Amino acid sequence: MAVCARLCGVGPARGCRRRQQRRGPAETAAADSEADTDPEEERIEAGPARCSLLELPPELLVEIFASLPGTDLPSLAQVCSRFRRILHTDTIWRRRCREEYGVCENLRKLEITGVSCRDVYAKLLHRYRHILGLWQPDIGPYGGLLNVVVDGLFIIGWMYLPPHDPHVGDPMRFKPLFRIHLMERKSATVECMYGHKGPHNGHIQIVKRDEFSTKCNQTDHHRMSGGRQEEFRTWLREEWGRTLEDIFHEHMQELILMKFIYTSQYDNCLTYRRIYLPPSHPDDLIKPGLFKGTYGSHGLEIVMLSFHGSRARGTKITGDPNIPAGQQTVEIDLQRRIQLPDVENLRNFNELSRIVLEVREQVRQEQEAGEGAAPPREPSAKAADGPPAKDGKEPGGGAEAAEQSASSGQGQPFVLPVGVSSRNEDYPRTCRLCFYGTGLIAGHGFTSPERTPGVFVLFDEDRFGFLWLELKSFSLYSRVQATFQNAAAPSPQAFDEMLRNIQSLTS
């Protein structure tokens, strides 16, 4: 009865309301006069009183509050004045800065400037949390890769640049474009880092969750005493690692000068759109991600490799006037394995061309018959390690030996055919697998774009190549080894939508 009384909100002496409703007046009076002597109910009634959070010692409340997400703490402060006072304890906010944003600096030095850890969390980290991660600037066809990170007591936007052409295996370069901090005042300070005269006044506007813009308020800091010529020479040395006199190819000189004129006009006043790293699956051919690739006279560019069922795609993160950033530069059909001939025959461009064009003809026939409209998702890329797909010719002689070598894990000898140009001659001489693919080519200004056949060459987990048949050119790609935080797509659908969005901007 005591348990029922608790649920009904009355004491045991008065009994259960529901039972009283079923009794008559005489029964109710008799029941009220009886003593409730059930020992089990007595033990329940005599249980310990509940403890309120308000009765806990302050140091325990600090520990509890510090373990909660920082976004929940403002609501907690509205409960009572005691909670509000405790939430001013810097220990709580120091832990939230460390656990949520990785700030491992000794935040005690902030006391000198009168800035608390609570200020750092609320006015810097939380306020600008939406700009952390990877972004692509809107710089016409050139694009770019910006990584916004928490760096100590700063939020810094680092522009990632490919290594100097043609050293595709070298690490990425990076330079700061802006920073935000609270070191000198209690409101966040945005500074432009562009140019060579040090930090100066800037502004950041968060347009929406996946878009923000930067503005420099002192563009005179970007100018150099020697005028545009000095600015160009400095930019060329940073961008290409050489002088204009070192570049003998006239067309390449024109492309370089065009890029300088186009990009310098923005003066670090840019709009950025969020990009995600591609999701990874166990059956992917290799780990997807960002790669540096050689693109002839355009130098090195950044490409994102992603897997979509039976196909792999390379999307440009940086671009050029022919194929702008955001476009799909290569597409690989993982169901159409190409067996290369032996090394001697591989040197013959016509032999390789014959093999690739036979596969293209097979693709065309299947598309006309309606069979290639919706290719099945299986077998997966990993399954391609088995026998090669039918390519119109049965491999024989040296090709069989090469196939056995590749399937045994030793790899297959690889050499570029005579007449095929490559910006980097230091490519691997052994490959694991080859697939049929297409590459996107176009005229200046992205005119008359078309997809042309080629060969995707997988060397290892971190390197692949693409042989452009029509251009008689070879692009070598090397993985970007940097680690990026806050760059994972919330879902595969969000990643696909991101690809569509950046492609539509330059289509």
From Swiss-Prot:
Residues 19-42, 366-417 are annotated as: Disordered. Phosphorylation at Ser-264 by ATM following gamma-irradiation results in its stabilization. Phosphorylation at Ser-448 in absence of stress promotes its ubiquitination and degradation by the SCF(FBXO46) complex. Phosphorylation at Ser-33 by AKT1 promotes association with CDC20 and ubiquitination by the APC/C complex. Zinc-binding is required for the structure of the protein and facilitate folding. The destruction box (D box) acts as a recognition signal for CDC20 for degradation by the APC/C complex. It is found in: Cytoplasm; Cytoplasm, Cytoskeleton, Microtubule organizing center, Centrosome. Pathway: Protein modification; protein ubiquitination. Residues 33-42 have a biased composition (Acidic residues). The modification Phosphothreonine is found at T37. GO terms for biological process: anaphase-promoting complex-dependent catabolic process; cellular response to oxidative stress; DNA damage response; mitotic G1 DNA damage checkpoint signaling; proteasome-mediated ubiquitin-dependent protein catabolic process; protein ubiquitination; SCF-dependent proteasomal ubiquitin-dependent protein catabolic process. GO terms for cellular component: cytoplasm; neuronal cell body; SCF ubiquitin ligase complex. Substrate-recognition component of the SCF(FBXO31) protein ligase complex, which specifically mediates the ubiquitination of proteins amidated at their C-terminus in response to oxidative stress, leading to their degradation by the proteasome. FBXO31 specifically recognizes and binds C-terminal peptides bearing an amide: C-terminal amidation in response to oxidative stress takes place following protein fragmentation. The gene is Fbxo31. Residues 50-96 form the F-box domain. Residues 400-412 have a biased composition (Low complexity). Its main location: cytoplasm. The modification Phosphoserine is found at S33, S264, S448. A motif (D box) lies at residues 50-55. Belongs to the FBXO31 family. This is F-box only protein 31. It comes from the Eukaryota. Part of a SCF (SKP1-cullin-F-box) protein ligase complex SCF(FBXO31) composed of CUL1, SKP1, RBX1 and FBXO31. Interacts (when phosphorylated at Ser-33) with CDC20, promoting ubiquitination by the APC/C complex.
